[in-house]
Amino acid sequence: MAPEVLPKPRMRGLLARRLRNHMAVAFVLSLGVAALYKFRVADRRKKAYADFYRNYDVMKDFEEMRKAGIFQSVK
């Protein structure tokens, strides 16, 4: 029984092949993370700001601050 000879690894272009594969995976992962961030964080934050400013009354807030004595120039 003769020992089996392992085939030689293909070394030519090894770095280019690995970089191509890893770049494709990195690109897909970055798109996934960007989409996840947009839908989980950015859209919720945008909606929260819109809800806040929809009901925000500037004059009411100003009067509360004036009554609390925050402004020195407005009595």
UniProtKB/Swiss-Prot annotation:
How is the protein disposed in the membrane?
Single-pass membrane protein
Gene Ontology terms: biological process:
oxidative phosphorylation
Membrane side Mitochondrial matrix: which residues?
A: 1-13
Q: Spell out where the chain crosses the membrane.
A: 14-54
**Localization annotation:** Mitochondrion inner membrane
Which ranges does the record list as Mitochondrial intermembrane topological domains?
A: 55-75
Recorded GO cellular component terms are: mitochondrial inner membrane
Classification via InterPro entries: Cytochrome_c_oxidase_VIc (IPR051389), Cytochrome_c_oxidase_VIc/VIIs (IPR034884), Cytochrome_c_oxidase_VIc_sf (IPR037169)
Pathway(s) per entry: Energy metabolism; oxidative phosphorylation
Keywords attached to this Swiss-Prot or TrEMBL record, sorted alphabetically, are: Membrane, Mitochondrion, Mitochondrion inner membrane, Transmembrane, Transmembrane helix
Which superkingdom, per the lineage? Answer: Eukaryota
| Family assignment from sequence similarity | Belongs to the cytochrome c oxidase subunit 6c family.
What is the role of this chain? Component of the cytochrome c oxidase, the last enzyme in the mitochondrial electron transport chain which drives oxidative phosphorylation. The respiratory chain contains 3 multisubunit complexes succinate dehydrogenase (complex II, CII), ubiquinol-cytochrome c oxidoreductase (cytochrome b-c1 complex, complex III, CIII) and cytochrome c oxidase (complex IV, CIV), that cooperate to transfer electrons derived from NADH and succinate to molecular oxygen, creating an electrochemical gradient over the inner membrane that drives transmembrane transport and the ATP synthase.
Subunit composition and interactions: Component of the cytochrome c oxidase (complex IV, CIV), a multisubunit enzyme composed of 14 subunits. The complex is composed of a catalytic core of 3 subunits MT-CO1, MT-CO2 and MT-CO3, encoded in the mitochondrial DNA, and 11 supernumerary subunits COX4I, COX5A, COX5B, COX6A, COX6B, COX6C, COX7A, COX7B, COX7C, COX8 and NDUFA4, which are encoded in the nuclear genome.
**Name of the protein described by the UniProt record:** Cytochrome c oxidase subunit 6C
Which organism was this protein described from?
Pongo pygmaeus (Bornean orangutan)
Write the lineage as a comma-separated list: Eukaryota, Metazoa, Chordata, Craniata, Vertebrata
